[in-house]
Design a protein with these regions (language model features):
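N-terminal membrane-targeting hydrophobic helices
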Residues: 1-175
Length: 175
């Protein structure tokens, strides 16, 4: 299995060619920049090794607690953490859920302290809709899709590097 430093180097080396490919496909500089940023984030912070005490996990610093349940629930190198199809999708859904839960807890503590009404599920849905509207305004119509594609490619480069490393060591193409 390649080291964290090897994964980081591969992420950095592939980021510019990924952005160039995104520009060749879309012809949109800003969308290519979003893909580039997603690739860097996906490779360095949001990759498959968040289920271990990896450098990706360590980079979350004081926010590592977000990933504690994920680390305990998913087996390392499983199809759910390292899978090309499910890995990034699952991490995005998990992260959005954790952020929503943390926001709910903060809102609950705040309303308990100062009084008022606790926000309901519809309030959180409205906030996520506003996040989508804001991101469309900031990143463009395809910005979130470009961000996800970049994150997926960054995480996929990690998984494919693991597969290649396993093949070199054992002669078997598997995780």
């Amino acid at each position: 299995m390649p080291s964290g430093k090897t994964h980081d180097t591969i992420t950095v080396l592939l980021a510019v060619p990924t952005a160039a490919a995104a520009f060749a496909v879309t012809g949109d500089f800003w969308l290519s920049l979003v893909v580039f940023c997603g690739f860097i984030f996906g490779g360095l912070m949001f990759g498959p090794d968040l289920d271990t005490g990896s450098s990706q996990y360590g980079r979350w610093s004081i926010f590592r607690f977000f990933w504690f349940p994920y680390r305990n629930f998913f087996k390392h190198r499983s199809r759910w953490s390292h899978g090309l199809i499910f890995g990034t999708v699952l991490r995005v859904i998990y992260f959005m859920g954790v952020v929503t839960c943390v926001a709910f807890i903060v809102a609950y503590v705040y309303t308990a302290y100062v009084g008022g009404n606790l926000p309901g599920v519809s309030d959180f849905a409205r906030v996520w809709a506003q996040v989508r509207t804001y991101s469309d305004r900031l990143l463009g119509e395809y910005g979130l899709a470009g961000l996800f594609v970049g994150m997926w490619l960054g995480a996929a480069s990690h998984t494919l590097t693991d597969i290649a490393g396993t093949y070199v060591k054992t002669g078997k193409a598997g995780l």
